[in-house]
Amino acid sequence: MSAVVEFRDASYRIGARDILKSLSLRIEPGETLVLLGRSGSGKTTALKMVNGLLFPSSGELLVDGRPTTAWDPVRLKRGIGYVIQDVGLFPHYTVAQNVGLVPRLEGWDEPRIRERVDSLLAQVGLDPAQFAARYPRQLSGGQRQRVGVARALAADPTVLLFDEPFGAVDPVTRLDLQKQFLALRRDFGKTSIFVTHDVREALLLASRIGLLHDGSLELVATPREFQQSTAPEARAFLACLEWQPERQ
């Protein structure tokens, strides 16, 4: 079975600085690959390369078996759902209009769009009767993130990209959103690439974890394998789970 996304010795550099170094990685159908790393490790750069916001300086990146440089840019982006930390909802559009935007651009008829919007809102835990006509300013941070996830799923994309989507909400809401993500993964079976610097989140959500350090892929492992790894960078992240402040 061919990979949905494949990095083939892909590097990205700005001037003399290597942001990503010879990344080779396959993301298989239906899996959630979590890219874990410190700030500046290249996680978001890798994500932007998948949907054609950036292109490899060397090597190549394939989506559905085709190099991103060979895709029509619009078709590539519309085939990928993207969820980011600040959501990026259009403030002058209602929730329903935001979620239905890409299906409308794809030429879906209005009854089909309404059905899809209502179904997705319900699946992310928002009652369509209460939320479809609201504007983003009328939503909490957690509710906006749920709308962002629904929008990403709306046109049935090949792959979903999540760039630290839950980092700006409180811990209780964050756990609720993580549980919702796991439920959606079970229901939709979508291939996902999820970026985080939170090792707890990586262990909870990942099928496999790709550990990036200073632009290099240090380790690819299941959550269980990651917890047993002796790799120094993996141990540094796992130590965050164990540390407790000294009690006076």
Residue locations for each model-derived region?
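Helix-to-loop junction immediately C-terminal to a conserved catalytic motif
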Residues: N51
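ABC ATPase NBD coupling module
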Residues: P67-G81, L105, E110, F226-T230
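Short helical segment in ABC ATPase nucleotide-binding domains corresponding to the A-loop/adjacent helical element
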Residues: A96-R104, R114, D118
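Conserved ABC ATPase signature
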Residues: R134-L139, Q143
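Conserved catalytic motifs of ABC-family nucleotide-binding domains
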Residues: D156
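Catalytic Walker B motif of ABC-type/P-loop ATPase nucleotide-binding domains
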Residues: L160-D163
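Conserved ABC ATPase "signature" C-loop
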Residues: D214-G215
